[in-house]
Structures are given as C-alpha cells and as structure tokens.
Regions:
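Beta-loop-alpha module in the N-terminal Rossmann-like domain of NAD(P)-dependent dehydrogenases
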Residues: 3, 10, 15-76, 276-279
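Short alpha-helix immediately C-terminal to the canonical SAM-binding loop
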Residues: 8-9, 149
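A short helix->loop->beta-strand "cap" motif at the edges of active sites that frequently abuts
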Residues: 17, 53-55, 80-82, 200-204
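Hydrophobic residues in well-ordered beta-strands that form the structural core
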Residues: 21, 59, 65, 84-86, ...
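Rossmann-fold dehydrogenase core element
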Residues: 71-89, 108-116
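Predominantly a Rossmann-like dinucleotide-binding segment in NAD(P)-dependent oxidoreductases
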Residues: 90-186
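C-terminal glycine/acidic-rich active-site capping loop/insertion
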Residues: 171, 175-188, 194, 199, ...
Length: 285
C-alpha cells in the first residue's frame, strides 16, 4: 500500500504482489504490524491510523513532525497497549555495540567531551526526487543527524540540554541528478545546524550538521575521556573500524566485521558492507 495509490499499483505490478488501499490495509485482520516508509509529513497520520486499527507500527524517521506530535503518539500507544518503533536502528549494529562495550569497560575513562560532524552538500546531487529533504520534517538533523544522536544516546545515555542555532544558505536548490536535472527546489527548512548536547552523565558534545558544505576533513563521532580518545565509525552504517587511543599512545584499530550485525552482507559496486536495515523492526516484535 502507498499514500500514492498509483505508486502502489506500479510497485505491485513490478514485484507481482497484492496491492491494497490504505483503508484496506488497516482493515485487514491478518496484518498486525505496519511498516511506515512514507514521507515525514505523513508519519504521524499513518502511525495513528495503525494504532486505531489495533496494529503495531514501525516507522521511518522522524517519528513525527514535532515533539508534541510524538507525545500524542506515545500516549495513544500506551492507551492501546501497542508498540511503536522508529528508525534509525543502525546503533544495534556491531560498531555501535562494540563502541558501547569499550566505554562500559572504561577503556578511555569517563567521557568529558566529544564532537559529531555531518556535513555534505545535500541530496539534490544524487536523489531522483529530493524535494522532501528540504521540507519541514526533514533537513540534515531529522534526516541524517538522528543517526548520530541516536548512536550518542546509545553510548552516553539520555540528553539533558540542547543548544543550537540554524541557518538556510539558499532559498532554492537546483537538482543535478536524473531524471529531473535542472529543476528548482524551494528550501523550506534550515540546512545548517551548529550546537551542543549536554548529557546527564555530564558529557558535552559539539556538533555540526549541514548540507551547505562541499568538502571537509572532520571525522564522524569523536569521544574524549579522562584516559584516552575514541573515534566511532559512521553511525549510518552497522559496522566500521573503531579507533581508540590510550592517553598519548598511537591509535589502535578495533574491527567488528566478524561480530553479529557486522558481517558484510551487501555488495555495493564490488565493495561489501554490513546492511541489516530492518533489525529494529525484528527486535520490536
């Protein structure tokens, strides 16, 4: 099913599967869980429809367009006694779990400071239909930054305080990917965020989240403890080498590609990597 029935019909024909309208899907008693992969502006509506139809729901991120909507979903979920889950689930991968194990074993001591950096020039250079990335409910934080924040919560616990400023560098963007090369996109959400996260364990993390950067040399996540430093691999993926240094020693490479949810299983132009998208849904049920 799809909120765009034409798209649902086309996909069903391509893959030779049954197609249903949204209402038919929600009324189907044989289905007890909905996977919600709609654009961000539709997430809350589909989740609420699922819950009202007595079905669990696992959604693409973000959970909702704002905090108030997320609280409404939480309240309804509890009232119905049903589960709601949300991406990203990459923190369940080998890289996230190994990083957490190292921190729990006090490998670099108490975490005092850190950084995370997500910077590129946006989505219009490669995505065939990039419009929704620049609408409310998307942008660099809600689309990709959530991978970094989720990983940090996995590693450091809950966040106590957030400080941030934002900006929009361009009012319009030009698509340079096919098939819509040359079309203009109206930018309706900030494309740069700079700020800090303060965790309940007193760790302070500085962050840059931007789609206004052509090139940079920053790493993804760095954590600085009283006994050493750690570089956590890209949280958009399930595995990757961890770099760790004890005090003033050289960097040590810690691999996790032999661990559960770290074994390479997907080919990308001849290069294998670990891709276990959907593990969050499996874990929820």
């Amino acid at each position: 099913a799809d909120i765009d029935q034409e798209a649902a019909d086309k996909s069903a024909k391509e893959h030779n599967v049954k197609v249903q309208t949204d209402d038919e899907l929600m009324a189907n008693k044989e289905i007890d869980l909905i996977l919600n992969l709609t654009p961000p502006s539709s997430h809350k509506d589909i989740i609420v429809k699922s819950l009202m139809s007595e079905k669990h729901c696992f959604s693409e991120k973000p959970l909702a367009m704002n905090f108030e909507e997320a609280l409404e979903i939480e309240k309804l979920s509890k009232e119905k006694g049903l589960k709601v889950g949300c991406a990203p689930d990459t923190f369940l991968g080998a890289a996230g779990q190994k990083s957490r194990e190292l921190l729990e074993n006090n490998s670099i001591g108490k975490i005092v400071l850190g950084t995370f950096n997500l910077m590129s020039h946006g989505m219009e250079d490669w995505h065939p239909n990039p419009d929704f990335f620049f609408k409310p409910g998307a942008g660099p934080v809600l689309d990709v930054g959530v991978y970094y924040i989720t990983q940090l919560v996995n590693l450091l616990g809950p966040i106590k305080l957030i400080n941030s400023v934002s900006s929009t560098a361009q009012e319009e963007r030009t698509i340079t990917s096919q098939p819509r090369y040359g079309e203009k996109i109206k930018v309706e959400t900030p494309t740069t965020f700079i700020g800090s996260l303060e965790f309940y364990n007193d760790a302070k993390i500085q962050f840059f989240c931007s789609w206004d950067v052509w090139k940079h040399k920053h790493t993804t996540i760095e954590l600085y403890g009283l006994e050493g430093s750690m570089i956590v691999p890209d949280p958009n993926f399930f595995s990757g080498n961890i770099l760790m240094s004890k005090k003033n020693e050289d960097w040590q490479t810690i691999s996790n590609d032999k661990m559960l949810l770290g074994i390479p299983n997907k080919d990308d132009n001849g290069s294998m990597f670990a891709n276990y998208r959907g593990i969050g849904l499996a874990d929820m049920i």
